[in-house]
Amino acid sequence: MKRVTITIDGEQTKGIVIGTIAANHTAAEWLLTASVSAKSAKVRFDPEEAVAETSSLVMIAPTRTEKYLYLVPDEQVQPVTTIVRKYGLLSPLDWDCPDYPAGDAFEHLFLQNKLWNDLVTIEREHRAKYRELIGSDEETAQMDTEIASIKDRLSVLDEGRKKLRVEHRKKKCPEIDCLDENIKKLKSELKAVASKAKETRAAAKDRIRAAGNDIENLEKDRQAAVIKAYNNSGLWWGNYNAVLESYKKARIKALKDGAELKYHRFDGSGRFTNQIQGGMSVQDLLEGNRNVASLRLVSSGELGDISGKKPPSLDLQSVGSRRDSREYGILAITLYTGTDEQSKKFRRTLSFPVILHRPLPEGATLKSLSVHRKRVGTDFVWSVVFTFTTDCPTYDQRSSTGNRCGLNLGWKKQAGGGLRVATIYDGSDARHITLPQAIIDGLDYVNGDLQGRIDSAANENHAWLLEQWGGDELPESLQELRSMLRRSKRPHPAKFAKAVIAWRNYPEYLGDARDEAEQRRKATKRLTIEMAHKREKLLRRRMDFYRNTAKQLTSVYDVICLDKMDLRRLALLEKGDGTPNELTKIARKQRQQAAISELRECLSKAAAKNGTQIEQVSTASSATCSACKGKMEQVDGIMWRCRECRALVDQDINAAANLFREVL
């Protein structure tokens, strides 16, 4: 579905395209299979009349209870473009303002986290009742695991048989015959288990159909529990709506992946969301015409005076650069963080110094804004995300080039430095996308040297503190902490810090040792802060590299073909049958550094923006020769050889070439 603007009775109205009717066809058949939401809308056209040209079904909802369905020729439909702008914020100026209740804004973040956890509890209880209603699906899950295990064993035996055939240069010998017999038995076993699994799934579907009314009532109970949870959350509607949207998206993904929603530990992070009814122009935002949000532009010097921080300085090299074109302002947003004596919503404002590294989009309508608070180490980083809509595209509509490519995702350390994360083949040339070595070195330092120093300090501090607190004269409250430390399976800097802070209440007890404990705590804290900030910076650099790469690819190619690979299986330490995953320790580290799921996500977003088509296919792209379609076998590392034509090729280039041929 996409948002569009149409003209009705001479006035422009925004709506959502929910379907398309081809020329010389009617909408009657489409309406028969339409969703409940579409069927409940009032139809403003004759569904039995054939359209002369391809038209779009547009749903208009002027109120929450009214829905109208229009049939509009495509040439009269004007797409609405969504623009998202993210800017950095300095710390709020009135976070602990005496004019407002103490800790009210912080409490609002806590309530949002609590609402999320309440929704997770509701979802888990709903899943448990659903499983109880339709019967246990453990048998089906066990069979799926058994099928996956048999397939893995078949794959291992088949690979061994191929190697023996190459080694003996014939298809028959005692060793190969033994493998053939084992493969035959496994295939027979797989067929029997698959047949039984099919019967089990059919029986489960019958149980679901039989329990249709009960399942419907169970879903109604879940929805009622969700409504009760957000009504009793104590949150303003804009903020509980943001939590609900996150819950709906996470729930759909969890149901699709067979996963479970997880509770969130509250660490002070969160967001404040203002949804602007009817929208607001950029001019209204700058002039402060609406109390929901305002942005007052100031000079860099004034920003420094207000925030108490030194204003950013510019040198001659910055003149004419993007940094030179920055603007500064004070962003004020309205929050409802509680109720007064008359049980009315209590309104307050939060003000932030903001750095506008890029201009706000002209002529756009502001629909919502979110202020985010994220913990990084012991500090918090603030940012604001504006969501605008406009009828004018914000980027040049590129003409079709007809270019296509196959893109194979993976990771491989390059001899010249860097980590290969993808290989592109477009029919004439093959090239690699390489993550810069500077990012790899930084991640190695953070996750290796720095993390190791923190772990060593935690172990040393743990043993040292237990030695200092070994006497019987230890105060009673500290004895409880000592017991907690002794029970800990793994020393942690936070546990040591908690114990040292509690020690401050007893300055007379081992004063010299207490001073040393403070020094140890501060040293560990410095390392922890350094690690958190360096990791955050490196992850931002990697994301920026992937975004730029995705933008370049989608500006050149009309169609990009990817392998439909399940990245979750690569993250598992064990297979379904309990056997270890094939990835080595080094390969696992490189997988985390590459984070190819982020590259795939960036490609998806850039393709949607630039009009590039992403095709995902399931094919044995690495094991099939791109030249003759013969079977490939590994020779040395990344190099594979075809058994038929004896071509020696890079595995990634061969896979990218096979993907390219899928979209020819």
From Swiss-Prot:
Disulfide topology: none
Cofactor (UniProt): Mg(2+); Zn(2+)
Binding residues for Mg(2+): D652
Region Target nucleic-acid binding (TNB): start-end pairs: 618-650
Entry keyword annotation includes Nucleus: no
Region (Linker): 391-404
GO molecular function term, any single one: metal ion binding
UniProtKB keywords: Antiviral defense, DNA-binding, Magnesium, Metal-binding, Plasmid, RNA-binding, Transcription, Transcription regulation, Zinc
Co-factor: note: Binds only 1 Mg(2+) as opposed to 2 usually seen in other Cas12 enzymes; lack of the second Mg(2+) results in loss of target DNA cleavage activity.
GO biological process: defense response to virus
Region of interest: Recognition domain (REC1-C): 213-270
Binding site for Zn(2+): C625, C628, C642, C645
Residue span of region Recognition domain (REC1-N): 1-137
Region annotation (RuvC-I) ranges: 405-618
Pfam family, one: Cas12f1-like_TNB
UniProt-annotated stretches for the region Recognition domain (REC2): 138-212
Alphabetized InterPro entries for the sequence: Cas12f1-like_TNB
Ranges where the record places region Wedge domain (WED): 271-390
Region (RuvC-II), start-end ranges: 651-664
Family under the similarity heading: Belongs to the CRISPR-associated DNA-binding protein Cas12m family.
Miscellaneous notes: Part of a type V-M CRISPR-Cas system.
Domain notes: Has a bilobed structure, with a recognition (REC) lobe and nuclease (NUC) lobe. The REC lobe (residues 1-390) is formed by the discontinuous recognition (REC) and wedge (WED) domains, while the NUC lobe (residues 405-664) is formed by the discontinuous RuvC and target nucleic-acid binding (TNB) domains. The crRNA-single-strand target DNA duplex is bound in the central channel between the 2 lobes while the non-target single stranded DNA is bound to pockets in the REC and RuvC domains.
Protein's job: CRISPR (clustered regularly interspaced short palindromic repeat), is an adaptive immune system that provides protection against mobile genetic elements (viruses, transposable elements and conjugative plasmids). CRISPR clusters contain sequences complementary to antecedent mobile elements and target invading nucleic acids. CRISPR clusters are transcribed and processed into CRISPR RNA (crRNA).
Protein's name in the database: CRISPR-associated DNA-binding protein Cas12m
The organism of origin for this protein: Pelobacter propionicus (strain DSM 2379 / NBRC 103807 / OttBd1)
Lineage summary: Bacteria, Pseudomonadati, Thermodesulfobacteriota, Desulfuromonadia, Desulfuromonadales
